[in-house]
């Protein structure tokens, strides 16, 4: 559980400190989602419950869809502006 908390805090710090680069913001959000998934899996294992493992599969699927949508928006943003920096 400590590992998932550390990963979540790294994701929050990465999101806050890298406000200029969209790719690093998306990666930070993914780290936060995977930290939550790890916490759900560990809790599911400790309580001997299969629903947590099923829920973690849904979280991973949503994280993949979120990454695909975010990268699609990033490509459109690059075509419109010519760079991916937020502050220009």
Swiss-Prot record:
Gene3D superfamilies: 1.10.287.3510. It is a multi-pass membrane protein. One of its GO terms (molecular function) is NADH dehydrogenase (ubiquinone) activity. Keywords: Electron transport, Membrane, Mitochondrion, NAD, Respiratory chain, Translocase, Transmembrane, Transmembrane helix, Transport, Ubiquinone. The keyword Transmembrane applies. GO terms for biological process: ATP synthesis coupled electron transport. Its main location: mitochondrion. GO terms for cellular component: mitochondrial membrane; NADH dehydrogenase complex. It is found in: Mitochondrion membrane. Its EC number is 7.1.1.2. It catalyses: a ubiquinone + NADH + 5 H(+)(in) = a ubiquinol + NAD(+) + 4 H(+)(out). InterPro entries: NADH_UbQ_OxRdtase_chain4L/K (IPR001133), NUOK/Mnh_C1-like (IPR039428). The chain crosses the membrane at residues 22-42, 57-77. It holds the Pfam family Oxidored_q2. It is an enzyme of class 7 (translocase). Core subunit of the mitochondrial membrane respiratory chain NADH dehydrogenase (Complex I) that is believed to belong to the minimal assembly required for catalysis. Complex I functions in the transfer of electrons from NADH to the respiratory chain. The immediate electron acceptor for the enzyme is believed to be ubiquinone. NCBIfam families: PRK05715.1-2 (NF004320). Belongs to the complex I subunit 4L family. This is NADH-ubiquinone oxidoreductase chain 4L. It comes from Trimorphomyces papilionaceus. The gene is ND4L.
């Amino acid at each position: 559980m400590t590992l998932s908390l550390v990963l979540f805090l790294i994701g929050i710090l990465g999101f806050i400190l890298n406000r200029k680069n969209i790719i690093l913001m998306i990666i930070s959000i993914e780290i936060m989602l995977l930290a939550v998934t790890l916490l759900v899996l560990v809790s599911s294992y400790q309580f001997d419950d299969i629903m947590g493992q099923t829920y973690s599969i849904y979280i991973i699927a949503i994280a993949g869809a979120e990454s695909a949508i975010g990268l699609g928006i990033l490509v459109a943003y690059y075509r419109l502006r010519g760079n991916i920096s937020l502050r220009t």
